[in-house]
Each structure stands twice: as C-alpha cells, then as structure tokens.
Amino acid sequence: MAGVSSESLSAALASLETKLAHASLELSAELFGTVDVLDGNAGLRRALTDPARGASDKAGLVAQLLHGKVSAEAESTVASLATSRWSSARDIGDALETVAATVAIAVAERQGGSAGLERLEEDLFAFIRVVGSSHDLQRALDDSKATAEAKGALALKLVPNASDASALLIRQAVASPRGLKPVALLERFVELVAKRQDRWIAQVSVTRDLTAEQTARLQAGLNNLYGRDLKINVEIDPALVGGIRIKVGDEVVDATVATRVAELRRQLAS
C-alpha cells in the first residue's frame, strides 16, 4: 500500500489510537467480518472507494450494509475508512484488516502490558513454527473444501494455550488469508505486534554515558509522560555534539546540538 492509501491508513490508525482504551476483541472480530464482506463484493468495494461519490453517500452505504448488524463503533470505523481516499478498491479491505488486527493487539497490550504483547508474539510464532515444519498441516489449512470453522478448530489445537487475542488472529489467518498463506498473514500480524512493542521502548541517543542518577530521572520522566514503564536503550553518538534525542514508537523528541545547528543553517540558507 502506497501513496494516498498509505496516508489514509496512517490517519485511520492515528484516529483509532484515541479509542483503543475501550476497544474489545468483539470489535476486532466485527471488523474482520466486514473485511470478509468487502472481499466478497467487488461492486461494494468500488462504490466505497469511488472518488466521485461524496462522503455522506459512502457513509450511507456503510449504514445500509452494517447498521444493526455490528456495533456502532464498528460501523463508525468502517464509515471513516470509506470516506477516506484510496488508490485502489482493494486497499480499503487491506486497511480494515490492519485496523482489526491492531484492535486485537491493543487489547492484549491493555490486558498484559508489554508482557501481553510478548505472549501474543510468542503464540503467533509458535503457530508459524509448527505449521511451517509440517507439509500435512499446510495442506490441511490450504484445503479449499474444508470449512473455516474446521480450519480454525485445527489451528487452535496446535496452540492450545493461546490467549484470546492470539486465538482470534490465528483463526482469522486460517479462515480468511485473503490470497496469502495463513503463515504469511500471521507474519504480517507479528510485524504489527512488533511495532506496538516499540511503544514500550525508549531509544535514547546522547554524546556520553548517562550517570545512574540521570538515567533514573530520565526513566521516571518518560514513564510519567507516557503512562507506562518503558525500557530505555541508550546509544552513544558523539556526532550529536550535545543534548539528547529520544524515540518512542513513532514519536521523536530531538534536542541535540547537531539538529539545532542544522536547522539554523536551513534558516540562513532560505
């Protein structure tokens, strides 16, 4: 996904972030179910991504499709995606799949913090390893004659201790891999988990080692700012000249001398 579709997905994920504190696995399942509906109706995908249609028209189509069948939160999430811009009709389904998986991952995070994300990742990797080492299992999960329910039941037998979030993502991958092998789709989900884990790590760049007191103050300040216990990784970079650069997830705080000098040079050159 690239261009305008990538921008629309980024905006959707940013908007979703404000709602994840109350999100549920039920919401994730509803969104995954809507992905299946979109995949089965090319005309609907084209209608929802047609740039000639107005936002209210698209929202109306979503209401006709989903109202009373899913939660209001699921309906509004799909409507928001429908009123965004997409490079191709398929991209809206891909984006909704990413949003649905992100909801499930965030639920695991809310329930267990960083440890919850680690367990989710371990569950998914365990399934990937088991299936990847067995041609018989791969054939069984690829069998077009087998029902989604049968594939899901088989998959969960392979990871009997999987968390609820893990089970949801695994079932989705085997029941609706959307043109991929189930393992390949789960690997994409693992990438989303890893990106979520980055929110628990502060990458700190400084010109020299921090003292124990400085590290403790930095730890306390970052934990207070982000509302969670972050792991701090310190990198020594003499090129920064002075100051500090902190990266947590996609957020970067750059208070280095090198950056300030570069900005001054840009201003003088303009």
Language model regions located:
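Elongated, mostly alpha-helical coiled-coil "stalk/stator" tethers of large membrane protein machines
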Residues: M1-R245, E251, A255-S270
